[in-house]
């Protein structure tokens, strides 16, 4: 799975509000944050005092050298040595404090990232299915990878850099004023020029940074989709089409990234140029003052160093501005995700039904539903299913078969009417308790990276190895499992491509058998395997459905001849219902569907 790249910056829609919410989130890390800020300030103060102390040694050296040349004295190396040792101690303390604040901020930022990833993972389980059906996998993954990583890296760097930059500017300004107010005024003249140039660059680069963020999501989604379906792409020889689509998106990403990085990269040369102008001005004026005896050589050396240190925070603040924007934009996207409306996980306590009462009886009473208010999929659906019955739902694509399953498991709620289990509305059950009553075997089998034993045990996590093996035998999966290298301990890869499609379905059937649910949903479970494998799967299915209410959705009508009830759907409504023989004798829509399949085979 591709790892989305880290973005540089994007402007948040609500910068202040997002930062306020981020600070509230970090409130339980207040102590390490304050401690890190204090150590950052102390480190900066000791670092700022360095040039002023060094100036004493420089002045002593210059004065002693002149005195030696005139024959009136010598260089006081003892005094210079004491000053340099004191200076060394200051810089060692500054480095120690800087190390401590870096260690604290790294730990703090990673803990914040850890908390966000945990909250996002928990949030995913509470989001409705509709959220994921409207978004690409890459977009959801980018919240956990790209956005959280950007947030962590920006948080780690921006806060301490902001504190040290502001402290440096204030401290350096105080030191410069203590040396020469007039030279300080000259040095400050570079500020308006620097700020104006920075604002111009930021203004022009911002739109390209935003385009870069948006285009990266498109590229991530395309790469993820192509990787997941690379077999289909190759089978249809669509490599050129996919490559053209990717190149188009990649070109847009390149253009926006190149322009944003180029404009951002202009800041440093511009600031260096302006800073050098300041050096020249200070050097000229300082030389005049030194010639007049109003300032010492050491103070000139210290002042020039302070001018350099004064322009560095300005450069850093421009970088901090980008990092803060990047952090706010990433945090805003994370908070938008965390603030998404959730499914109501629990039912009203006054009406809450006990899941133990689910005995397999299902009643659809005048159900009406549409994914959007202006488009109704199911118009008026009524049906009663008795415990243990096998119910087949058939109909053309788009008739509403899969939608019925989603309503039954409360992935969506009905717009009108009701669905009841043993007389209790499905909305009276906690969602988790309701879904525990259902077992599913889908055409798109889902197996995770792990052993075969672990994949089957997913149906009931507390099952023993013996129970797992018994479920595999009941699903006709035990034989092929024993022939695999490593048997039940064989490791499946990420997409389970080291077992066949039929074997995947047998494993999912074994998992469902182990779960021992009262109601089963079998959605197109045998439509993508060969006839012999289908017979094995069908045998396992029959064994699975014994004594359980089962809803079978299949286009192969030959597989549901023995169903107790067949519901024929067209345009969201049940147009016919009955057994296979009854529907054939009626000569209606079901008979047309059934006969058309055999006509296709003959042709």
Where are these regions (language model features)?
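Juxtamembrane helix-loop junctions of ABC transporter transmembrane domains
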Residues: 8-15, 38-39, 46-62, 66, ...
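A short amphipathic helical element positioned immediately N-terminal to and/or at the very start
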Residues: 15-30, 140
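Transmembrane helices of ABC transporter permease
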Residues: 28, 32-45, 157-211, 282-295, ...
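An intracellular "coupling" helix at the cytosolic face of ABC transporter transmembrane type-1 domains
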Residues: 28-30, 129-130, 148-155, 159, ...
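Transmembrane helix-loop-helix hairpins at lipid-water interfaces of multipass membrane proteins
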Residues: 33-97, 178-182, 293-297
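Hydrophobic alpha-helical transmembrane bundles that constitute the permease/transmembrane domains
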Residues: 41-49, 91-99, 151-154, 158-170, ...
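Helix-loop-helix
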Residues: 64, 175-189, 259-333, 337-338
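ABC-type nucleotide-binding domain
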Residues: 355-603
């Amino acid at each position: 799975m591709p790892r989305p790249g880290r973005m540089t910056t994007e402007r948040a829609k609500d910068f202040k509000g997002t930062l306020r919410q981020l600070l509230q989130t970090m409130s339980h890390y207040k102590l390490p944050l304050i401690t890190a800020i204090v150590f950052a300030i102390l480190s900066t103060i000791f670092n700022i005092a360095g040039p002023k102390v060094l100036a004493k040694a420089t002045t002593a050296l210059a004065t002693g050298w002149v005195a030696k040349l005139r024959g009136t004295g010598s260089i006081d190396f003892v005094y210079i040595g004491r000053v340099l040792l004191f200076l060394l101690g200051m810089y060692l303390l500054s480095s120690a404090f800087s190390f401590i604040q870096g260690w604290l901020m790294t730990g703090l930022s990673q803990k914040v990232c850890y908390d966000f990833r945990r909250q996002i993972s928990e949030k995913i389980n509470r989001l409705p299915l509709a959220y994921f059906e409207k978004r690409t996998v890459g977009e959801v993954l980018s919240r956990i990878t790209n956005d959280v990583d950007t947030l962590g890296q920006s948080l780690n760097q921006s806060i301490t850099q902001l504190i040290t930059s502001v402290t440096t500017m204030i401290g350096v300004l105080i030191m410069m004023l203590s040396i020469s107010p007039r030279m300080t005024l000259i040095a400050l003249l570079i500020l308006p020029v620097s700020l104006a140039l920075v604002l111009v660059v930021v203004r022009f680069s911002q739109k390209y940074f935003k385009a870069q963020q948006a285009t990266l999501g498109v590229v991530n989604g395309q790469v993820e989709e192509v990787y997941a379906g690379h077999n289909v792409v190759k089978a249809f020889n669509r490599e050129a089409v996919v490559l053209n689509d990717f190149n188009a998106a990649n070109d847009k990403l390149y253009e926006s990234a190149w322009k944003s990085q180029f404009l951002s990269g202009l800041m440093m040369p511009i600031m260096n140029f302006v800073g050098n102008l300041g050096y020249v001005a200070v050097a000229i004026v300082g030389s005049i003052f030194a010639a007049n005896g109003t300032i010492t050589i050491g103070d000139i050396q210290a002042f020039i160093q302070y001018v350099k240190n004064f322009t560095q925070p300005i450069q850093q603040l421009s970088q901090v501005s980008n990092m803060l924007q990047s952090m706010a934009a990433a945090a805003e996207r994370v908070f938008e995700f965390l603030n998404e409306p959730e499914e109501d996980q629990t039912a009203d306590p006054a009406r809450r039904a006990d899941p133990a009462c689910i005995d397999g009886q299902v009643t659809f009473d005048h159900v009406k539903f549409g994914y959007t208010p202006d488009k109704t999929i199911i118009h008026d659906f009524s049906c009663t299913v008795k415990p243990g019955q096998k119910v087949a739902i058939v109909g053309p694509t788009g008739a509403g078969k899969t939608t019925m399953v989603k309503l039954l498991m409360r992935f969506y709620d009905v717009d009108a009417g009701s669905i009841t289990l043993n007389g209790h509305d499905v909305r009276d059950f906690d969602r988790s308790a309701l879904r525990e009553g259902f077992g599913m075997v889908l055409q798109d089998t889902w197996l995770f990276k792990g052993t075969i034993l672990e994949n089957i045990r997913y149906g009931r996590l507390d099952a023993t190895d013996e129970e797992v093996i018994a479920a595999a035998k009941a699903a006709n999966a035990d034989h092929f499992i024993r022939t695999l290298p490593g048997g039940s301990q064989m490791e499946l890869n990420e997409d389970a491509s080291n077992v066949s499609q039929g074997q995947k379905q047998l494993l999912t059937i074994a998992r469902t058998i182990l779960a021992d649910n009262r109601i089963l949903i079998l959605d197109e479970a045998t439509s993508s395997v060969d006839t012999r494998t289908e017979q094995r799967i069908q045998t396992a299915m029959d064994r699975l459905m014994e004594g359980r209410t089962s809803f079978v959705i299949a286009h192969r009508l030959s597989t549901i001849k023995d169903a107790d009830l067949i519901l024929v759907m067209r345009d969201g409504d049940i147009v016919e219902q009955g057994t296979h023989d009854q529907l054939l004798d009626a000569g209606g829509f079901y008979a047309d569907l059934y006969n058309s399949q055999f006509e296709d085979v003959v042709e």
